Amino acid sequence: MIKAFLIERRSWIAAFLFQQALMLFIAFVDPSISFGNVLYMVYLCILFFIIFLWFRYRKETAFYKSLKTWENNLDVTAINEPETPFEAMVERSIAGQTEHLKQTAARHRLALENEKDELMAWIHEVKTPLTAMHLIIDRMEEKALKSQLSYEWLRIHLLLDQQLHQKRISFIENDLSVEFIQLQPLIFKEIKDLQSWCIQKGIGFDIQLEAKEVLSDAKWLAFIIRQLLTNAVKYSEASEIEIKSFQKGEQTQLQVKDCGRGIDPKDVPRIFDKGFTSTTDHHDQASTGMGLYLAKKAAAPLLIHIDVESEFGAGTVFTLTFPIRNQFEHVISV
């Protein structure tokens, strides 16, 4: 800040130094003027000027120091009161811009809330004809057509479910209900929902649940597992998907292993990025690049750590590591 102040006042300093140099020059060329007396006077003036500069630095920079340390949280009360007309102009400008930003942010927030509410209402409305469609498909007797329609229905259902959770995920902390959850019924339900797709692709499941329960939120854990299972089914053909749970130290781990196409090593660091699909199968129009991104985002407030190991062309293993009980103390009282 001192450097900035000196740069700002460099014209004043230059004018003062020029004036002192001029006085010394006149005393030097004019024998009638005592050079020693003038030199002493210049010394006193410089000393006084330095003290004056220091005083002005303390006074004039207090306001701007508060601006520099301002956290940009739109709270203008954190800024020091202006003491000069120019500081008052700056303060009024900042206050005006801040108020404008607050109003703009409020309008955008309201618009986003309305958009979210409308979209969620639309999704819930669409679920009614989807349910009716599912009942109609179940009554069909032609197996080939029934299988194809069931698959397309499932795709629509999963996309709507993903969209619904995407809109809710911003407020996930308000929606958590952490409790001990039995893994078997939760996993079996998710597999049952994918049954028609799995039959169509010839995919089975090998389930070994040594650890029977985990501490989490049932709805959001089901969503995370759903994303991992749909990925495993999507990229596998005529194979088994292994689902295992076990204890590792004090923590419970759940693994979902498929024998699908695997992930290219250069893609592994990016698979949880929003919108990322693949660099090897970039033409894949069915992939949205949102499933794993949302799974990772939902896992964070649940303190679930997701690891991935993959061998390109051989398969992928996703591992969910669940927190121990006391790790949830800062999230919710269990």
Swiss-Prot record:
GO process annotations (BP): phosphorelay signal transduction system
Membrane topology value: Multi-pass membrane protein
Any one GO MF annotation of this record: ATP binding
Domain Histidine kinase: start-end pairs: 121-326
Residue ranges of the TM segments: 13-33, 35-55
The UniProt record lists the keyword Transferase: yes
Residue numbers on the Cytoplasmic membrane side: 1-12, 56-334
Reaction(s) the record says it catalyses: ATP + protein L-histidine = ADP + protein N-phospho-L-histidine
Name of this protein: Sensor protein BceS
Organism of provenance: Bacillus subtilis (strain 168)
